Amino acid sequence: MLNIFSLICICLHSTLYSSSFFLAKLPEAYAFLNPIVDFMPVIPLLFFLLAFVWQAAVSFR
């Protein structure tokens, strides 16, 4: 359990303190991918929530 908590903290730390990474712009040739790139940081959180939904579906066995 501690390892999972540590991993979450590391992910949040790197996300919160790398704001300059989010301010970078894609090259013009890839500008059409902007909506997808904006959504990409949220994808790991969706997998995290999916784990809880899955466990609820099997009654937290």
From Swiss-Prot:
A biological-process GO annotation: photosynthesis
The keyword Ubl conjugation belongs to this UniProt entry's keyword annotation: no
UniProt-listed InterPro entries: PSII_PsbK (IPR003687), PSII_PsbK_sf (IPR037270)
Places the protein is found: Plastid, Chloroplast thylakoid membrane
Superkingdom classification of source: Eukaryota
Keywords: Chloroplast, Membrane, Photosynthesis, Photosystem II, Plastid, Reaction center, Thylakoid, Transmembrane, Transmembrane helix
Topology of this chain in the membrane: Single-pass membrane protein
Maturation propeptide residues: 1-24
Annotated Gene Ontology cellular component terms: chloroplast thylakoid membrane; photosystem II reaction center
Transmembrane segments annotated in the record for this chain: 36-56
HAMAP family, A to Z: PSII_PsbK
Oligomeric and partner information: PSII is composed of 1 copy each of membrane proteins PsbA, PsbB, PsbC, PsbD, PsbE, PsbF, PsbH, PsbI, PsbJ, PsbK, PsbL, PsbM, PsbT, PsbX, PsbY, PsbZ, Psb30/Ycf12, at least 3 peripheral proteins of the oxygen-evolving complex and a large number of cofactors. It forms dimeric complexes.
Family of this protein: Belongs to the PsbK family.
Function field: One of the components of the core complex of photosystem II (PSII). PSII is a light-driven water:plastoquinone oxidoreductase that uses light energy to abstract electrons from H(2)O, generating O(2) and a proton gradient subsequently used for ATP formation. It consists of a core antenna complex that captures photons, and an electron transfer chain that converts photonic excitation into a charge separation.
Protein name, UniProt field: Photosystem II reaction center protein K
